[in-house]
Amino acid sequence: HDDIGLGFEDSSIAAAGFNAYEHRKFLKDYYSGVHPGSPASGALFSVNPKTQDARISGSLASLCGLEKALESRNQSLIDIAVKKILLMQAQSFFVGGIPMLFYGDEAAYTNDYSYLNDPGKSYDNRWMHRPLIDWKKNQKTKEAGTIEHLIFSGTQKLLKLRKQLSVTADHKNIRWITPHNIHVSGFIRSLGDDHLYCLFNYSNKAAYLTWYAFKEQGYQIENLYDHWNEKRYSVGADYEYLIIEPYSFCLLAAQKKS
């Protein structure tokens, strides 16, 4: 991304039971770090003083909390930020279109504030997410255990899966899943007899999704293979459930009953 706009339809937010003005205010406050407890380190760009509309600047890593986590040297918060970054990238890559990386995202670059020392850039905070490349940092993408390696290898795996799974090619084949759990964003990509359930848990708590959610489309499913976590699940009774860990996601390929 460059600066992020909040150009959604007010009616869409109202249909979800929220006030569009207050929803925008929350997003602006959260990602600019003003909201109490927000882990994000962003900034507002192009603020309209009359309407209070604004856009959001900041690198993906900083908006997901990595900058503050590193400053506090809190390993738990660092781990959460890494999970959030891959969660955001996963939904972006698998929802359709051409997967796009904003440079620096592949190595978890946080905001670069050096632009403030340049009179030709200091007036425009979008430069914070247009970092100068640090080649020593880039080398860390090859060092197992580093944040850079976790993000780089995770991003590579996501792109490999997107390329490998033909059902994710752009066939306008997305169907959004009934929101049985409000914290889970989910859709199905279908092509012929192939069905891929893409599920993303945006909560800081584990999400429970009943197996009925995988049956209500009428597919006769026996088990599901998660390409991301490389695990197989047997589909249980309607009242039993799949557990998705906090800030985690699943890419579940359906396998029919024989």
Description of each model-found segment:
Residues 2-258:
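Active-site and adjacent substrate-binding regions of carbohydrate-active enzymes
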